[in-house]
Every structure is written in C-alpha cells, then in structure tokens.
A protein has these predicted regions:
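N-terminal, post-signal peptide beta-strand-biased segments of exported outer-membrane/organellar beta-barrel
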Residues: 18-104
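Residues on the lipid-exposed face of transmembrane beta-strands in outer-membrane beta-barrel proteins
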Residues: 59, 70-72, 155-161, 187-193, ...
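Residues that define the transmembrane beta-barrel architecture of outer-membrane proteins
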Residues: 64-66, 148-153, 181-187, 203, ...
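Repeated loop/turn-to-beta-strand initiation elements of outer-membrane beta-barrel proteins
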Residues: 79, 164-167, 196-199, 254-257, ...
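Extracellular/periplasm-exposed beta-strand and loop segments of Gram-negative cell-envelope proteins
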Residues: 83-85, 131-147, 176-182, 214-241, ...
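Outer membrane beta-barrel transmembrane domains
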Residues: 258-336
Length: 336
C-alpha cells in the first residue's frame, strides 16, 4: 500500500515518469493518494458535469404532434482561474512534505499548470533501512498547460407524441483513441405548459419545463504503458446527472429569444482499477488491487439566455449559460 501515491502521480502525469523505475518510488499510501487525486481531479470532472448538460433546449414552444427534430449540438465550457489550482497543505497528508519544507503551496489541478515544477518528498518504510524518502514532481494539468475551455458535441433527436410534449435523446458513440474510450447518452422530456391553455395563441410567450438525464463514461487502459507491472490497469470514470429547467421563449415564426432557469445535480465516480505489482527491487513485494476510488457530488443553479433563427425546416440557435462553469452552445436542427 505504500506505493500507491507514487503510482497515482505517474498515471496523472501522463507518462512524465515513464523513464523512471516505479519500484524506486515507495510512496505514501492510499489515504494520501486519494486525498491528492480528489483535489487534483475534481475541478475537471465538475466541468464535465456542467458541460454535458448544455444544449437540451433551443426554444420554449413545443412541437406539433408527431413532429421530429434532429440536431447537432456543440458546446464549450469555460474554465475559471480558481479551478486551475488548489492549496495543498502538508498537514493534510501523513507521509508527504514539500522539498523546501513549505507548509503549503498552490499547486495545479488537472486544468492548471505548475510553472515551475513543484516537487514533494514521499516517506516510505524500507524493510532493511527503515524510513526513506524519494522526491517526486507533482503532475501538471492536461497537456502540460493551462486549460481554458473544454469542448463537447453530440447528436440529439426529439419526437412529439402529443402537441407540446417532446421526448428527447442525445448520443455520442463510444470511441477509442490511444487507449482512451469515451461515450455519452441521455434522455429528456420537455413539456410546454402554455399548450394546455384554452387560448394559447393569445399568450405572448411559451413556457415549458424540462427534465433530463445524462450519462458519460470513459476509461483509459494503460496496462501496456509499462508504468508498473500488473494486469487490466485502467482509470474508469462514470458521470450521471439530472437537470430540471424552467424555460420561456417568444413565439414568432422566424426569430425567437429564449431563457431558462435550471437546477443541476450530478455525481462522478473515478476508479483506479487493476492489479499493481510493486516491490523495492530486493526483498519486499506486494500486489495491490483496485487501490483508489474517488466520488464527487455536484449541485447548482444555472441561467441560460439564447436566440433561435428558423428558416423553413432548418433552424440554428446559440446560447450562453451562467453557472459554476460558464458555457456557450451552438445548435443546428432540422424539424419536420
């Protein structure tokens, strides 16, 4: 269990230490590894939770009965400076200290960048020589640079079994690129409340409600990277979210503006799974299985403002959402 923190840093660093011998890095254990991994990864998973919930609607008015809508949604989530770093206090860790003996430092999350590099000293128990230390450089962010935005895209379809009621589904196929697999799907229901009014045409705006569920799962298989001996070594992430939204829009034939007030609830689970064979190269060896599991829950309000232009069967919309992670969306739809 003493090598888990070093293993975690190796994986998070995307191969920075691939030329080093993991067996020389006897690290600080599961507790410290999970603590650091949680602070390091949480802003990234939260940004995804907010990002994959955009683009569910482009108007407040429901479709005609038996109407279809097929569209492509592109979204960009913006990253605030406060999400790019966190304060790492050595008092929160059992076997870690900074190389210069600082009590705390501001270090990068997965969305940030350490410039210059920041190192920590990991204390471990050697079976012969007792307590020993090894120096490890903390991982920087994705791509070794600051991340200012995270893009997403998906196909979305809608069907109206009744006037004013629209069933929605969105999908992004699971694609494998360089041992990384990511896929997304979701379902939603949008109901126009003003469609129930006896004189709905006299009402100046359309008001509707939306409930939507989105699931994203991804995995990174690094067994063949040779970071440490073992089998079926992967990082797996599962994200599940629910969105409740109240929507209002104008009801003109070509150009309309719309807005929404929503409540978002999401949960992410990130696991380091597989077997990891670690040793000191001489006497000590140990196999660690599924060492780390990180869970994060998110709730928050959001406000969306946008516009929609309809030209025959086709329409295009753009909107901006203000939330813990702001975002902008662009959609292209065909309705019939």
């Amino acid at each position: 269990m003493k090598k888990v923190f070093a293993i975690t840093l190796l994986i998070l660093s995307s191969g920075i230490y691939a030329q080093q011998n993991i067996d020389d890095l006897l690290a600080a254990g599961v507790e410290d590894a999970e603590r650091f991994s949680t602070d390091y990864l949480t802003p990234a998973t939260e940004s995804v939770i907010y990002g994959i919930n955009n683009g569910w609607f482009s108007h407040g008015k429901g479709q005609k009965q038996f109407g279809f809508e097929i569209g492509l949604v592109a979204n960009t989530t913006f990253i605030k400076s406060s999400k790019k770093s966190f304060e790492m206090n050595v008092s929160d860790y059992r076997n870690i200290r900074f190389s210069d003996n600082s009590s705390s430092k501001t270090v990068a999350t997965a969305l940030g960048n350490n410039n210059p590099d920041i190192s920590v000293m990991l204390t471990y128990d050697d079976p012969i020589f007792g307590n020993q230390e090894v120096e490890v450089t903390l991982p920087t962010g994705i791509g070794s640079a600051d991340v200012n935005m995270i893009p997403t895209a998906f196909l979305q379809v809608g069907f109206s079994p009744f006037k004013g009621t629209q069933l929605k589904a969105r999908y992004f196929p699971k694609i494998a690129v360089d041992d990384v697999e990511t896929g997304l799907y979701g379902f939603g229901l949008q109901q126009e409340f003003t469609a129930w009014l006896p004189q709905e045409k006299l009402f100046p705006v359309a008001v509707s409600g939306l409930i939507a569920y989105t699931h994203l799962d991804g995995s990174y298989d690094f067994t063949d990277e040779g970071i440490v001996e073992g089998e079926n070594q992967q990082i797996k992430t599962n994200i599940n979210t629910v969105l409740l939204e109240l929507i209002a829009s104008t009801k003109f034939k070509m150009f309309n503006v719309y807005g929404g007030l929503g409540y978002l609830s999401g949960k992410s689970e990130t696991d380091l799974v597989g077997s990891f064979n670690v040793s000191d190269g001489v006497l000590f060896s140990q196999t660690i299985t599924n060492p780390i599991s990180i869970e994060d829950k998110v709730t928050g309000m959001r406000t969306t403002l946008g516009a929609n232009l309809k030209l025959g069967l086709f329409s295009i919309n753009a909107d901006y959402t203000i939330a813990e992670f702001d975002s902008a969306s662009l959609g292209l739809q065909v309705s019939f």
